[in-house]
Amino acid sequence: MNKEVLDSILPTMDTNDIVELVHNHLCGLRVMENKDREDVKVEYGLNEDIEDNSREELINALYKMNKKINSR
């Protein structure tokens, strides 16, 4: 999904939905980069337990992960 799509859907999502989207992006990046899930979390500034991140931290990580995914 592109940045414009994220811009439009994130304000309508609750934190649980954003956590789920982060998990999905992590799975995609883990496969694309052939890295351990924990390494990918660290790379994008996420806590071990995704749910322990603030909404802002989750959204920032999503934009970074989304940019990486779209650059491939």
Which residues does each predicted region cover?
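Short amphipathic alpha-helical interaction elements located at domain edges
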Residues: 1-72
